[in-house]
Amino acid sequence: MAGKLMRAVQYDGYGGGAAGLKHVEVPIPSPGKGEVLIKLEAISLNQLDWKLQNGMVRPFLPRKFPFIPATDVAGEVVRIGQDVKNFKPGDKVVAMLGSFGGGGLAEYGVASEKLTVHRPPEVSAAESSGLPIAGLTAHMALTQHIGLNLDKSGPHKNILITAASGGVGQYAVQLAKLGNTHVTATCGSRNFDLVKSLGADEVIDYKTPEGAALKSPSGKKYDAVIHCASPLPWSVFKPNLSKHGKVIDITPGPRVMLTSAMTKLTCSKKRLVTLLVVIKGEHLSYLVELMREGKLKTVIDSKFSLSKAEEAWAKSIDGHATGKIVVEP
């Protein structure tokens, strides 16, 4: 495909929001050693995508401009690089592109073989594209930070999941209920039925005084909180935690990181932990298998064509999507 062009969406610098996106034609990338070229069928947006555009980790990411954003994709392998052993052209796959290096809002993308997994015919491209960052963030929070076994074994845990109708929250509720848990979830009242259908035992409206205070309707103290919403002060979490309760914050800012450090330095029994997701192919493959078995699903808020990527971007920035926002080339 050398010399051939593809449609893509990129931005030329920090800031600008949806208006900063540009539709371009660029050369189709070539897979390097240990990489696969994927014809993209679905791209799932994450908050991280537009936060990078806003300069959240400048000057480290994006590494250079112009930059094609988005990393979580599903599609079909069309070409393999040197030393690729597990994939061949025609394979349907789910992948994370470029380890936060972007490239997703396009017709084709290159992924490392290590961050690519096979997608069975029972699992759609749109549904599986939500898994790499959002699904694995939920999985990592539950299994590594909380120590939950996803097979109903182990000690019972009371878990709170905030923003449970969002991209990460929806997966966290479903995965948590595979373990020995009682799950309390927060969301807006319009999403109560949805979140209950995902398995939540209790649902509270974050707009009510009780919801804002994270109070469990049954009066339970939380052994763990997976916080997927906007930052809250430690004083809101602390009284709701059990003796050794833990808060896992998936979108930590400077203040959250400071609080996390303080709870560690003071040897507090109640802890605030920040989570930076690590993408591993074996964990992604596990989530895809759960989907195939019908134990995990993706709630899709909306789908947009690549030509309307700005609308998808704006909706993601708005922050009120129910589930995942998907772009289809």
Curated annotation (Swiss-Prot):
From the Swiss-Prot or TrEMBL record, give the protein name: Quinone-oxidoreductase QR1, chloroplastic
Give the Enzyme Commission number: 1.6.5.5
Conditions for induction: Up-regulated by 2,6-dimethoxy-p-benzoquinone (DMBQ), 5-hydroxy-1,4-naphthoquinone (juglone), 2,6-dimethylbenzoquinone and menadione. Up-regulated by host root contact.
Activity regulation remarks: Inhibited by dicumarol.
Q: Which Gene3D superfamilies match?
A: Medium-chain alcohol dehydrogenases, catalytic domain (3.90.180.10), NAD(P)-binding Rossmann-like Domain (3.40.50.720)
- Alphabetically list the UniProt keywords: Chloroplast, Membrane, NADP, Oxidoreductase, Plastid, Plastid outer membrane
- Catalyzed reactions: 2 a quinone + NADPH + H(+) = 2 a 1,4-benzosemiquinone + NADP(+)
Please give the GO cellular component terms listed in this UniProt entry.
chloroplast outer membrane
List locations, semicolon-separated.
Answer: Plastid, Chloroplast outer membrane
Q: Which GO terms describe its biological process?
A: alkaloid metabolic process
**What family is this protein classified in?**
Belongs to the zinc-containing alcohol dehydrogenase family. Quinone oxidoreductase subfamily.
What does the record give as the function of this protein?
Answer: NADPH-dependent single-electron reducing quinone reductase. Involved in haustorium initiation in parasitic plants through redox cycling of exogenous haustorium-inducing factors. Can use 9,10-phenanthrenequinone (PAQ), 1,2-naphthoquinone, 5-hydroxy-1,4-naphthoquinone (juglone) and 2,6-dimethoxy-p-benzoquinone (DMBQ) as substrates, but has no activity with menadione, diamide, 2,3-dimethoxy-5-methyl-1,4-benzoquinone or 1,4-naphthoquinone.
The GO terms describing molecular function are: NADPH:quinone reductase activity
- UniProt-listed InterPro entries: ADH-like_N (IPR013154), Chloroplast_QOR (IPR052733), GroES-like_sf (IPR011032), NAD(P)-bd_dom_sf (IPR036291), PKS_ER (IPR020843)
Q: Which SMART domains match?
A: PKS_ER
Which Pfam family, giving just one, matches this sequence? Answer: ADH_N
UniProt-listed CDD domains = MDR1
**Into which EC class is this enzyme placed?**
oxidoreductase
Q: Main localization of the protein?
A: plastid
